[in-house]
């Protein structure tokens, strides 16, 4: 009886690990692209039913490469984990924060407002909160081989592309693509900015 119970417990644990690998980013523990697409589809369907706007925001760190080049990927990973933590603390439990890979993050907001202008204002307020939080200094502990642990201060801003969605014919991939394009517009304008997409979603 004890052996059977242990086998079942181990099987449940194994299944949970497989599920986590399939749907979550191993570094930040955030939903990955696969789970993001599912959550976005759900948010889009809910928006269509309720008549309330939703929003998707695409974040890209502006000066992440310099940290990786100077201190290595392990230190870059520390920054990414802290970025995930900061974004999570700016959103509601019903919202989804995901990591697409590299230094790219996405947030899906649902149930904003029936009015487009009010929804854009709500989304802008949260986006600005996240932008400001991500721009605060990062204190990262590093230890190179054979040397004592030290703490470095790194400054990192973000470029943010946003798109509102409601009753529409666009796919989840279209929504992500439009937000991505808006993010590049923000980056080309100097970074540390929020840019809304003009695409109709």
Q: Language model features by range: what are they?
A:
Residues 1-7:
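PAS-family sensory domains
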Residues 7-20:
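Sensory coupling linkers of modular signal transduction proteins
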Residues 19-23, 29-55, 62-92, 98-102, ...:
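Conserved long alpha-helical elements within nucleotide-processing catalytic cores of c-di-GMP signaling
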Residues 97, 143-153, 159-189, 195-201:
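Cyclic nucleotide signaling catalytic output domains
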Residues 99, 117-119, 123, 134-158:
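Catalytic core regions of nucleotide second-messenger enzymes
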């Amino acid at each position: 009886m004890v052996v059977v119970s242990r086998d079942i417990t181990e099987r449940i644990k194994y299944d949970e690990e497989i599920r986590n690998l399939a749907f979550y980013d191993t570094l930040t523990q955030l939903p990955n692209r696969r789970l993001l697409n599912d959550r976005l589809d759900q948010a889009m369907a809910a928006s269509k039913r309720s008549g309330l706007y939703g929003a998707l925001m695409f974040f890209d760190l502006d000066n992440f490469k310099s940290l990786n080049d100077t201190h290595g990927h392990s230190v870059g990973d520390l920054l990414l984990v802290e970025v995930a933590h900061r974004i999570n603390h700016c959103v509601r439990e019903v919202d989804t924060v995901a990591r697409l890979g590299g230094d790219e993050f996405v947030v899906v907001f649902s149930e904003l407002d029936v009015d487009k202008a009010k929804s854009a204002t709500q989304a802008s307020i949260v986006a600005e909160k996240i932008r400001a939080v991500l721009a605060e200094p990062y204190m990262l502990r590093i230890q190179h081989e054979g040397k004592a642990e030290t703490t470095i201060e790194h400054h990192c801003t973000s470029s943010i592309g946003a798109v509102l969605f409601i009753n529409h014919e666009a796919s989840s991939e279209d929504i992500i693509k439009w937000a991505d394009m808006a993010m590049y517009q923000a980056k080309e304008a100097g970074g540390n900015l929020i840019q809304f997409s003009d695409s109709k979603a």
